[in-house]
Amino acid sequence: LDHVIASGEDVNIMVFDTEVYSNTGGQASKATPLGAVAQFAAAGKEIKNKDLAGIAMTYGYVYVAQVAMGADYNQCIKAFAEAESYHGPSLIIAYAPCINQGIKGGMVKAQETIKNAVAAGYWHTFRFDPRKTLAGENPFQLDSKAPTADYRAFIEGEVRYSSLKRSFPDKADKLFDRAAKIAEDKYEHLTKLAKLY
């Protein structure tokens, strides 16, 4: 992916972020968040996930968006339209619940889960459009609002987290507290980006 982005070619890339290797059975990956249980991380992943959007934005010439259809359909469509009209590499990262997350209530709750992820500050929506820099405007637009729901309550609504709480309650508390702090710091960082440019 990095090689394609670095090529500078006019290409649109869509990443469905399931936070695991979904196509091979749900193994932990660089996208798996801290505290989540997955294959090869049965006692909870102990390091935070890679910030793919942040890495792509460092190029400065890549259109980057994080979207969450269940949380903000209009932001999602706007990102698609902007990415398509951008002449250069564009990357859209969509929060995509999958069966490996163990959503309580099942996959029928996927759109509701996406909405709750944004409300809890678990996932953030934003757009980075390099064209705005050329126009003297801020290229970074934070679309999601400050979290209004409880982070821990959200993650404990998924088996990949609640199973850690059942098996290793003390460890789960420590990892979940760290994960909540990381999410809080991430939102603060994004609000600074929205003012920085």
Region locations from a protein language model:
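Conserved thiamine diphosphate
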Residues: 30-86, 156-163, 169
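Structural motif
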Residues: 10-14, 19, 54, 62-65, ...
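Glycine-rich loops and low-complexity Gly/Arg-rich segments
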Residues: 9-14, 37-41, 89-91, 116-120, ...
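Thiamine diphosphate
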Residues: 1-23, 27, 43, 49, 70-87, 163, 173-197
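Acidic, Ser/Thr-rich peripheral helices and adjacent loops at domain boundaries
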Residues: 29-50, 108-128
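Short helix/loop capping segments that flank catalytic or ligand/cofactor-binding pockets
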Residues: 22-25, 32, 101-103, 173-174
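Glycine/aspartate-rich loop-and-adjacent alpha/beta segment that forms the canonical ThDP
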Residues: 70-171, 178, 191
